[in-house]
Structure formats: structure tokens, C-alpha cells
């Protein structure tokens, strides 16, 4: 029987060798407007170095740094946060090339109302080649922004991601991570793990969620990440991230389309009932989420669900019929993917006769994604979802952003092409979390447009 729990490579490596890289997948640093001090600019360089050397993707939030040209009244003029962005890019480049795992990822975040946000959006890729950029926003920031056109163009180019600004129940801001599926306090970390839906019969789904959350909560207390002096201690940093992969495999096995599943999710959320295969899947999924939420609450977790980009994990996961499981909850771009790696050469992975994105269509996929996020959000323990848009289907305009802001989605991640003969989704992720993809990365970094990202 295939495993119903898909561990991240980081977690498995740590279990095998606790002296190796740390098991946490991601961390966040919010830079204060000062060169010195424990949360200042210089401290952020050390923090990023530590995160990369020990295998965690690092999001650096720059919005507290004064804009370029701002005078502090003491004769000093600020150079602005983008000038420091080049240092983070160089750190990632240098540490990746010299490190053991060669899997670093850094994302720079800036709020839409920062005075330098236009420079942040328009900075050419070659000036920040080893980092990605994300703009954080609220409804109000979007309405007041004078840079909507430039932001939309940045999204179209694939240079800019979006993340909604969020606060915890006590009014403290929490910050998006590298892949935008997790929200953390500064110096917080998160363990990730995924339920392999493709390995589940319907009756197995609730138990799989219970098992996955139980394992995460047990591991959370053992990691010792706070002992490093860089990360928050686990006693106060209370979150994990249980996600899922292989949804397309599960739907194929029970002959349920994304359209039917999405409509059923919508009906269930609105109080409907039924006995179709789609309804049985929805009910099992909802029960699993509720059971996992009880485990997280019993362990004093403040956030516990996160749907991460899981391409690398999916390659190591199979469904009940022996096919490779598809990443996260989206339909794949193709039924077959070739992965070219330095270690294993070209490997071909077959997803079986699953629905693919061009067959599903944007509206039906989004209905599924919104429905699952609604189920997670109702627990009060949801982080978010690394939600991709389909650039050859959707139109990036003001209406699109406003619909996204009104949706249960928390991020707008990669802009992927899904129609016809285009690259596989997992390649578009530029899977930096596994040493086996060095060949792909070497080819990528020899091109003019560099694409650095963390995913598992």
C-alpha cells in the first residue's frame, strides 16, 4: 500500500540525521528601519544566511525600511529597501553555489503602499536575479494605489506575486513566507507535511488527516529550532502546515470531474446534502479537516493547514494504482512529466488518465480551490494556498485582482501556461528544494531570465 502521508524532504532528512539541515520548510524576517539592532538590516543578513545554510526558504519583509531619498533629520539619506535587495540576492547565489544542498530560496516582500513599491515592481530581473518579489496588499491599498497598471504588468511578466496582508486574532500582523502558503511572525518557522489523497480510499481520508496532523504536532515539539538563537522557540511559535496532494488522482479513481467536485463543494458549503461519489469525497475531506483541526487545537496550534506547492513530494508519492501523484490540488498541465536531474538523468513520471488543466478550465479549477480553502478557513486554523493563475486563460486586469481579493484565496503565486505544448507545472515551479534538480537549475540560470523559488 502506498503511503497516505507525504513527508517533505526536509522532514525526512532531519528524521534520518538530526544533525543535518533543520526540518522546517520556511521562515520569515521582518526588517526594522535600522542598520543595527537584533531586528535590523545587518541582523537580517545573518538570519538569511542561517536559513539558507540549514535548508529553509526565507521571506524578507522590507516595508519598514524608509524609502529612497528619505532624510532622517540627522544628515543621513536613506538608500531605500531595493538597494539592500541586491545583498539578499547575492547571499542566495553564493550560499547555493557553495552549500551542500544547493536549494536556497529567498523572496522579498513589500507592501503596496510603500513609497518605493514602483521601483520594487519595475526593477529588472537581472538586478535581483536570485530572489523573487511579492507585493502585499489589502482591499484599501488596492483601491488607493496609483500603480495598478504597473502591478498588473509585473504579474503578467511573472516578476511579481501577490499576498494578502493578514493579522492574527490578537491584532498582530503575520507575514507571508517564500511560497506564500504560510503566515508567520518574524523569525517564526513552519513544518510542512501533506496528505496523499491519491493513496486513500474514501474511508481512509479522515484517518489520513488525523495521522498527518498528529505527526506534525508531535514533531513540532522535538525540532529544537529555537536553540539556534535565530528562530522563535517552539513553545511560543505555534504553527504547523498540513496540506494535500494527489487530488486529481483521487478524482480519477472515483470518476469524478473537477467540475462536479467543485459544484458539490459549493453546495456542501451552502448546507446541501447528497449521496453521489462527489458528495462522498467532499464529506470525507471535510471530516478529515475537522478531525485534524481537533488535533491541532489540542496541541495549541494557532495555524495548522497550508496547501504548499508539492512537486518534489509528488514525485516520491504514488496512488493506489501505482501512478505518480499530482502536485497539490490543481489539475496538472500534462499527464506525463519528464524530470531531468543531475543525479538520476531523465525520469518520466505518469499521472495516469487524470483530468488536465486545459480540460478542466479556469472557472472549475477556481471553484474547487475556493471550496477547499473555505473548508480550511472555517477551522480558524488556515494559513493559505500557493494559488497559481493560468496566464494563457485569465485576463490580468483590475476586475481579476478585485475578484481575487474577494475570494478565500490568500496568494497569487506563479502565472502558468496550461494550454497546448508548454512546460510542465513542476518545471515552472523551478523546484529548488531537491539537489536532484541541479541540471534543470544550471540550464535555467544560464538564461537571461532567472527564476528562483522554493517548493516541495
What kind of feature is each model-predicted range?
Residues 1-456:
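Long, C-terminal-biased catalytic regions of enzyme "large/alpha" subunits
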